[in-house]
Amino acid sequence: MPAKRRTKNYDNRPIGLFDSGLGGLTVVRAVREALPGEDVIYLGDTARVPYGNRSPETVELFARQDLAFLEKFGIKAAVAACNTVSALALPNILREKHSFPLGGVILAGVEAVLATGRRKVAVLGTRGTIASGAYEHALLAADPRLIVRSIACPLFVPVIEEGVTNGAIVREIFDLYLAQLLRDPPEVVLLGCTHYPLFRPALSQYLPKGTLILDSAAAAADYLSRLLKEKGLCAEPGRNGRAQYYVTDRTPGFERLARRFLDAGDGEVIDIHLADIVNS
């Protein structure tokens, strides 16, 4: 899997994105929209999904294996499109030197919040992400003046994966977790799970008018765009980027979910064996 050549002023090597499952495909979609000239390699470790119920040590091991697999493609940058990895594994991994810049959705989300200048923030996430305190700690470390509420929304992911993103059922689930936001509205709501952007239209209708909704997928794309420019790693202008999707287990509902997350059928889906990851 040789790297594509770097020209004098541009770098056409691919970007690597990875997640434990398919939620990270919302990040791929955002990156493809923001950076259409960039090639993207996505790894979905669907054979071991979810990472959220694993120990931090196991999550870090899996993340290192995922990165080692992507590194075979000669990637020029990588983003952990997985909140569990960003919370539990990335802090240790980032302490080491890498041949390419590496980031995650939590850092990107925090930067997006800070850029708004608003102080009252609500973070929505899975039970594991919220329990880790990763977003809250990162936000308060960046600006201690922020007022942060973290809300676990464990039913969001299974409902989204069933294809239900609006209607009475969704409203009932919002009432279950988010009624407090109607009584005491935040200025910013950060969607701290890569599945949650599919709820964004419904959330816009549910939350008080004027509430700014930020999603980690769009934030990751913005972060990556700035990173490539700062490091001089942008692809040649005018080229059409390509996407390749690697999965360790093509489940029966994979194509259906992939279409929902990507809003398009672009790119090639390639099945790989879990051994290809473990032995990377």
Question: Where are each of the predicted segments found?
Answer:
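Non-catalytic structural scaffold of enzyme domains
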Residues: P2-S280
